[in-house]
Amino acid sequence: MLMTGARRAVKVPFLDLGPVHEPLKAGILADIAELIDSSAFTNGPALRRFETAFARSCGTRECVGVASGLDALRLGLLAAGIEPGDEVILPAHTFVATFEAVTQAGGVPIPVDVGEDDYNLDVSAVEAAVGPATRFVLPVHLYGQLADVRRLQEVAAAYGLTIVEDACQAHGAERDGIRAGTAGRAAAFSFYPGKNLGAMGDAGALVTDDDHLAGAVRALREHGQRAKHVHDLEGYTSRLDTIQAIVLARKLPRLEAWNADRRRIAAVYGDGLRGVGDLTLPPVPDGSDPAWHLYAVRTADPEALGRFLRTRGIATGRHYPQPPHLSPAWAWLGLGRGAFPVTEALAAELLSLPIYPGMAPAQVQAVVHRVREYFGDA
């Protein structure tokens, strides 16, 4: 079917936050004006209100706001009792911050391959990787798809491992009735601007049902203080900025609607792109309800498809073309090419298509049409 001139002109950025921010702008500005008048710039009522609301949203007792998702992971591991040299099993296919959190907390990352069925931790590989120094397992709910946490809980219980979740891309996602953030002892979330729940700068949070762990993270984020000038721990400066807490509090009530919008777009992509060319669509295991942070398709030459779409006004992304174990920063792990075949295949073949709340139906259809056009199936 030939496209009209109007359809040919449709531009699709990889991410457009305008539709999200425009209806919230007046309320956010009013809240910031109130903050200025109160001078409660750090650890004040606005922060506590957001922490309470986000904990309720996740289904946990506690939420501790921190400066980033990386800090949430790092401080969560420290508060959970990681010791120098403790091994932490984690997926080879992830953003590098997962590895950074482990080493910055004094641990040793033990990557394992991911499964073809969800691109997350292969639970069988986790069990095979457990050794005498293994203390933690760190599942990453990549692209908004939960790892198989029910099976992972069984393995962790059998070997005495502590689960700390990297839920930085999984706000509101569920699998087998388990909500992101509730599968382990603690979970880290990122509120980087492009996340399903995003701030207007860097921000993060740790959620948990463990009151002692939450108290330790509160101390760690504030120079190790449990009381003014009483430093029980060597800590950090990692507070969640109050202006970001204000932004997040305004956005949180809309998270479910925004996630529903992402699901709608994912469904259109699925209907329009299934069976096209050599594309493999994102796998969704039975019982999984992804948050669709990213919509990553597999193809033999993602760079070529990305270039084709770019010339037609459609932006794409790569998540992630270089696995951490093949990055110079992690050469000391001694894991060369071929160590994790599924991870390395995904790194070579994945291309992320635009998916975000407020994406117009014409934009979604334009993506479908142009991808089909590339494969000669328009």
Predicted regions and their residues:
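Conserved active-site segment immediately N-terminal to the catalytic lysine
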Residues: 165-198, 227-232
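PLP-dependent aminotransferase-like
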Residues: 78-167, 174
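PLP-dependent aminotransferase class I/II
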Residues: 2-7, 18, 30, 47-53, ...
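Phosphate-binding glycine-rich loop
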Residues: 38-87, 100-105, 111-113, 178, ...
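N-terminal "arm"/small-domain region of PLP-dependent enzymes with the aminotransferase-like
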Residues: 1-40, 45
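Short beta-strand-to-turn element immediately C-terminal to the catalytic PLP-Schiff-base lysine
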Residues: 189-190, 204-209, 249
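Hydrophobic/aromatic ligand-binding patch that stacks against planar heteroaromatic rings
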Residues: 100-102, 155, 179, 196, ...
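Structural detector of well-ordered beta-strand residues that form the stable sheet scaffold
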Residues: 64, 89, 110, 162-164, ...
